[in-house]
Amino acid sequence: MSATEPTNEKVDKIVSDDEDEDIDQLVADLQSNPGAGDEEEEEENDSSFKAVPEELLQTDPRVGLTDDEVTKRRKRYGLNQMAEEQENLVLKFVMFFVGPIQFVMEAAAVLAAGLEDWVDFGVICALLLLNAFVGFIQEYQAGSIVDELKKTLANSALVVRNGQLVEIPANEVVPGDILQLEDGTVIPTDGRIVSEDCLLQVDQSAITGESLAVDKRSGDSCYSSSTVKTGEAFMIVTATGDSTFVGRAAALVNKASAGTGHFTEVLNGIGTTLLVFVIVTLLVVWVACFYRTVRIVPILRYTLAITIIGVPVGLPAVVTTTMAVGAAYLAKKQAIVQKLSAIESLAGVEILCSDKTGTLTKNKLSLHEPYTVEGVEPDDLMLTACLAASRKKKGLDAIDKAFLKSLINYPRAKAALPKYKVIEFQPFDPVSKKVTAIVESPEGERIICVKGAPLFVLKTVEDDHPIPEDVHENYQNTVAEFASRGFRSLGVARKRGEGHWEILGIMPCMDPPRDDTAATVNEARRLGLRVKMLTGDAVGIAKETCRQLGLGTNIYDADRLGLSGGGDMAGSEIADFVENADGFAEGFPTNKYNAVEILQSRGYLVAMTGDGVNDAPSLKKADTGIAVEGATDAARSAADIVFLAPGLSAIIDALKTSRQIFHRMYSYVVYRIALSLHLELFLGLWIAILNRSLDINLIVFIAIFADVATLAIAYDNAPYDPKPVKWNLPRLWGMSIVLGIILAIGTWITLTTMLLPKGGIIQNFGGLDGILFLQISLTENWLIFVTRAQGPFWSSIPSWQLSGAVLIVDIIATCFTLFGWWSQNWTDIVTVVRTWIWSFGVFCVMGGAYYLMSTSEAFDNFCNGRKPQQHTDKRSLEDFLVSMQRVSTQHEKST
């Protein structure tokens, strides 16, 4: 076969060898099963950019590259494959032992081993390993994303080399190669069509996510992983490997994977602050001990005690358990959580960037009210259009399926259709832009039926005879109106026997919104969520979909972002543009990624939905990546949450649940920080002033009891906030400090009054350590009932799991005191009852203080302070960063 004479064996094949299926049965199947035949519409499941100079793209299509040229270009640009970065899993696991809380736990383990306190050593090491294993397992899955992207690439390619058409492995293609494209070709690289007078239909769903094929002519660009549906042409390769769109998408995924997650930053910030408190407390204790010439072993024991209680060693485990229980609950609602921290992020999401197809819409074409020429009945138009449709269920395209399913609304056309006999059927011709069928009516009349691009159908009629001016004008105006509203229009015409062609009208069709989407969008607004559409579809289609859903219609072409070296907006103007836009259409992976990144730079928590390979980078970049029903493997791997139920409503349900889970975590963190501050203040003062401390074993039990009792917080009854929730850390610290001080004062009063001759807690006998242990355990355990409530602590009934866990721990702590476990001696029941009563009094004081703080706007303002206005500086920084990005892009293109 010649390089310039592609085979035409499969071209112009009019009738398949397969028998036509019964039209009545086909229509019945399609109408009874809305998903019938749709499986073939679904998408396949599955470094640095090197621009190629234009002088290397002047290859003669008839000759191609020589072997020497191929060798030179392969040395310069490498193989046509994505770079593989081997991740060191051992190092990845070790990094989970790095962090403020982990450092304190490790220091405590070393101290415990040095003091031969093997019980404490074992407990601390077990907590360290538990936290590390949970984190490692959650993040290990991310490494499969690039592998899933690779599955979309072709395995072989037909190229012109040395004047001959040869088949080679796809990874051996180099820039400047001439590729032959034909029906079914999976394009292995990015390139530009060089054949004259050609027309291809290319499925770009792997890039744009939109299932309808697009037309490509001479000079148009084609992209790696796209599939040629119909037509033949030659293409010159302009980019290979990591420089292709799919390669750059993989690079964006790797870039998005880098860095520390939002929740990890919050925990590290809390741990770092507590570590500072620990260091300050230790300095005070050491100075006091050295002043009294205390021996080194007691000093080390004091250090171990303060280290254990100063940082909440169980914080990661309890928070992880809370999110894991929430993930199990979400799984029952068909939402699979792949990254636990996504639950926390989803609770604070303010902007949802949603893909259109399949999420907001049904991903199935449906017909709308047709335009008919005067004198033509809609049933006649529908009958003609359905006659010009394939009758084979296997391979039936989306448009024919939509017409046949809609026959239920046209009973006369449906009844007449089986009476016609198909003599000849010509599938869609990308050149004439029409589908043609020759049929025989029940009366024996031969009729030619066509449907296709409206203006091409109009020209067919005009070539046969003049059309009245008013009909012509109305027809063209209707085409323009449908196009402006985002409809895909199909013209319909017929020719009876030897008569003239008749123009019948136009049938508009589009992917309609899901039935529940409009209500769900309103619910999202009520929850303080802004929905922006990011789609690869046309601007007109996106606007019409937004109009039907009640979303804003400020939809723009994604090219207007101007982040690839074009555009004249400054960085701050681009950020304003993205922030105020209701969505972007005709976008590629980089456009979606950039939009998410810009919104994040403005301080928003962003969620992104998607289903295709093209969505993988933005799914990974978003604070919460959401793969919707039917998503490809690459999208599912990149996402934090995978939904098995269709539509946006499932996402809103998950949002409410995540806010409930966040409320539980926030309650626990306030509680746990207050506990750490309580014991640091009390023990630090006790050691510094009286040179005494609790038994180290009792301190360990206090820490364990605090976390064991509150593990049940994961099952607590919790409300969901009506607005996005975030970590208000200044306020959180303010509340924790006040509660910690109240706890410390309560314990100090217990210590200083228990040995008084009259009115003390202990009369003539009892253990000092035992009473303090009980008082600390009771007040700390009950504190969770204060922090979990949004109002007074009695306004919200805790779950039986939480109440039961706290009660069991309280009983165990009471037994410790009654029987003198790990303390000097046993304590009588009267003293224990007095301790319970006193502890309840401290609990009531904490409840009142917490309620006042949580409802006081003045307290919130005091904690947060007055932030200086930095908008000008921020906008200047945005301008500078975008300018540098454009310079970098232009430099890459010129090298």
UniProtKB/Swiss-Prot annotation:
Molecular function in Gene Ontology: ATP binding; ATP hydrolysis activity; metal ion binding; P-type proton-exporting transporter activity
PROSITE patterns named in the record: ATPASE_E1_E2
Residue numbers spanned by region Disordered: 1-53
Active site, renumbered: D355 (4-aspartylphosphate intermediate)
Any one GO BP annotation for this protein: proton export across plasma membrane
Coiled coil location: none
InterPro entries, per database record: ATPase_P-typ_cation-transptr_N, ATPase_P-typ_cyto_dom_N, ATPase_P-typ_P_site, ATPase_P-typ_TM_dom_sf, ATPase_P-typ_transduc_dom_A_sf, HAD-like_sf, HAD_sf, P-type_ATPase_IIIA
Record topological domains on the Cytoplasmic side: 1-92, 138-268, 325-696, 752-801, 852-895
EC class: translocase
Key words, A-Z: ATP-binding, Cell membrane, Hydrogen ion transport, Ion transport, Magnesium, Membrane, Metal-binding, Nucleotide-binding, Phosphoprotein, Translocase, Transmembrane, Transmembrane helix, Transport
Extracellular compartment residues: 114-117, 291-301, 716-731, 823-834
Enzyme Commission code(s) on record: 7.1.2.1
Membrane topology: Multi-pass membrane protein
Biased composition (Basic and acidic residues): 7-16
Entries under NCBIfam families matching the protein: ATPase-IIIA_H, ATPase_P-type
Its job: The plasma membrane ATPase of plants and fungi is a hydrogen ion pump. The proton gradient it generates drives the active transport of nutrients by H(+)-symport. The resulting external acidification and/or internal alkinization may mediate growth responses.
Name of the protein this chain belongs to: Plasma membrane ATPase 1
